[in-house]
């Protein structure tokens, strides 16, 4: 379904097994979500010839050494990787703190050096945060299309529901459909499609 209907797929995994399983426990609390999803995600990446997908993780205060998670995903064979900082309340134990920022900057520097080294050796990968235009910012097309929620991007829950973005999961006003019925609320897609920064 996803390969047929989606031009780009985002696969949620946080990196190393212990890091992923800490924030992404199984629904019944038993076993490892990492062990369940890793082989499936590898299959998706290969079915797309390592293009038009991202493995996307979140780093938190629990894994400030997130470069290890990025490199773990690369070592597992993924070539399109995005690992981003958590959005959390300051009181959450896993929230990024002000004092974490210098260490996080070091992690980005270490990651950049390792990425250059691997590209030169012929086993590079794309890291989403490094794929930016430092001079011009987002292109006009991206400014017109916005983030792509609801039209270029969908969050699919473990139970198969579609939302325009992971930020909306659980908010029934934004439930767009599911894997069995497809997109049933095209009005939500249209609303997001018509949103831009101009």
Question: Residues of each region from the PLM?
Answer:
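Radical SAM/AdoMet-radical enzyme domain recognition
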Residues: 1-86
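Short, small/polar residue-rich loop motifs at catalytic or cofactor-binding pockets
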Residues: 147-150
């Amino acid at each position: 379904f996803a390969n047929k209907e989606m031009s780009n797929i985002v696969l949620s995994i946080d990196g190393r097994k212990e890091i992923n399983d800490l924030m992404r426990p199984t629904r019944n609390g038993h076993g490892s979500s990492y062990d369940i999803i890793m082989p499936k995600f590898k299959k998706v990446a290969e079915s797309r010839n390592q293009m038009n997908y991202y493995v996307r993780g979140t780093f938190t205060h629990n894994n400030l050494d997130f470069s290890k998670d990025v490199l773990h995903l690369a070592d597992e064979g993924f070539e399109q990787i995005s690992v981003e900082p958590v959005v959390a309340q300051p009181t959450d134990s896993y929230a990024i703190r002000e004092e974490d920022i210098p260490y996080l900057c070091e992690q980005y520097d270490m990651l950049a050096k390792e990425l250059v080294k691997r590209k030169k050796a012929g086993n590079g990968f794309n890291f989403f945060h490094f794929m930016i235009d430092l001079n011009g910012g987002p292109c006009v097309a991206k400014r017109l299309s916005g983030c792509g929620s609801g039209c270029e991007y969908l969050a699919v829950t473990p139970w198969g529901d579609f939302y325009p973005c992971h930020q909306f999961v659980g908010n029934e006003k934004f439930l767009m459909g599911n894997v069995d019925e497809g997109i049933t609320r095209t009005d939500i897609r249209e609303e997001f499609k018509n949103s831009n920064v101009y």
